[in-house]
Amino acid sequence: MAPLKLNNKNLSQIAAAGETQVKVPTYKRGGDVKEGIVHVGVGGFHRAHLAVYVDQLMQKHGVTDYAICGVGLQPFDAAMRDALGSQDHLYTVIERSAKGSFAHVVGSINSYLFAPDNREAVIAKMAHPDTHIVSLTITESGYYYNENTHELQSEHPDIQFDLQPANEKSPRTTFGFLYAALARRYQQGLKPFTVMSCDNMQKNGSITRHMLESFARLRNPEIAKWIAEQGAFPNAMVDRITPQTSATDKTALADNFAIEDSWPVVTEPFMQWVIEDQFSDGRPPFEKVGAQVVKNVHDVEEFEKHKLRLLNGSHSAIGYPGQLAGFKYVHEVMENPLFSKFVWQMMQDEVKPLLPEIPGVNIDEYCKTLIERFSNPTIMDQLPRICLNASGKIPQFIMPSIAEAIWVTGPFRRLCFVAAAWFHYINGVDDSGKKFEVDDPMREELQAKARAGGTSPAELLSIKSLFGDDLRGDKRFLQEITKAMEDIARDGILKTLPKYID
């Protein structure tokens, strides 16, 4: 049969239409529920992660106070506004694995606000008494966090704009919106909402707190004090591989499940969320749908460290060298025995010894699971997605392991190879001479430094906001990364890689 347009009217038909049965929401939506969560940055990951947890709470446990209002702050978010708006804010999650593909329609996003159309509506929504949580997936660059000083980038033009009292009703940044909404709640005698980062950063809650409190102190110390004393910013570890949706994915959804969806989400079956139980104005029972809610922030930090150093660090080891070698997808890289050995040995020999033991977690089994997930050919995870915004990733996923390895005199040559590959990747030309797009908020500065440095890392390492001062003065590190850069420049990735495999 012809595919059915995804919307409320067609849900019952969609549930019975495709070759494989599709799960659809049977819970109340629209005006019958309260939107207790406002989420900033509705992309693929949010729709495959937090929105799925909330969908399960609504479907299995009858939760009606925590539907999601999505928010887009950037002009490019108009595409998500239009896609969701055209289908009653429903969308399809397609889980792919060796066992096959499974689809279910998610209805936890109840509405969507596009800030460039109406900034006041976003502030009012956050400030509304029904809003208990404002969650974020705004990527590393959206936090205006200086990796070197660990402070707010208060001189950034957008932050400077939002700090002007005259601009409080027309902010540009997430922190401008959060502050404006919290200031209203303070004036109205309401509790502050919880600010819940779902971004892939270590100590994401602590960083969010520090950035927002720093912003608030520059605007109004009294409100900053209130946020510091009564606000909540839970730390969390989030995990689910979610590639960019392709036209092929939409066609497959129509062919196999008879659904016409403007913007479905493709993901893997695996999903994990470890979150600190720190909420200022209530929360839904996330633990009932598989989230690991922990009391101790230290527990979250240990899970975060495992995930960021092993999964995300390995993604970097796949992404930048893989792009230079001419691959397109993660699974293609892992099908190459050189790469699969390299990634395994980097995890086992250089990263694993630096990680804390977590009761009940077998690191070797976790590493094996990661190799299996990376090798999944069905989700078609694109290397450009892995390589996106590297200036916010490499300082978190690779450099801390190098610094710790130096401190304990451990091995780190493979980690240096990854950093060197990124330094070459910055130029936007692969080993065959083919150009590719470098999507990074610091691209111009990085490319200028890369051109000036050639095969020397010195120019790039001089960017203090990314690398600080310590590594530049370490002879072992400079020798290793310089050697890797020279080898890659001379021989290319595939001929250099065997030197880093035992």
Swiss-Prot record:
Catalytic activity: D-mannitol + NAD(+) = D-fructose + NADH + H(+)
EC number per UniProt: 1.1.1.67
The protein's name in its UniProt record: Mannitol 2-dehydrogenase
Source organism phylogeny: Eukaryota, Fungi, Dikarya, Ascomycota, Pezizomycotina
Keyword Oxidoreductase: yes
GO MF annotations in UniProt: mannitol 2-dehydrogenase activity; mannitol dehydrogenase activity
Subunit organization: Monomer.
Source organism of the structure: Aspergillus oryzae (strain ATCC 42149 / RIB 40) (Yellow koji mold)
Its biological purpose: Catalyzes the NAD(H)-dependent interconversion of D-fructose and D-mannitol in the mannitol metabolic pathway.
GO CC field: extracellular region
Disulfide-linked positions: none
Record Pfam families: Mannitol_dh, Mannitol_dh_C
Signal sequence coordinates: none
Binding site for NAD(+): I37, V38, H39, V40, G41, V42, G43, G44, F45, H46, R47, A48
InterPro entries named among the record's database cross-references: 6-PGluconate_DH-like_C_sf, 6PGD_dom2, Mannitol_DH, Mannitol_DH/Oxidoreductase, Mannitol_DH_C, Mannitol_DH_N, NAD(P)-bd_dom_sf
This protein's UniProt keywords: NAD, Oxidoreductase
Protein family membership: Belongs to the mannitol dehydrogenase family.
Gene3D superfamilies: N-(1-d-carboxylethyl)-l-norvaline Dehydrogenase, domain 2 (1.10.1040.10), NAD(P)-binding Rossmann-like Domain (3.40.50.720)
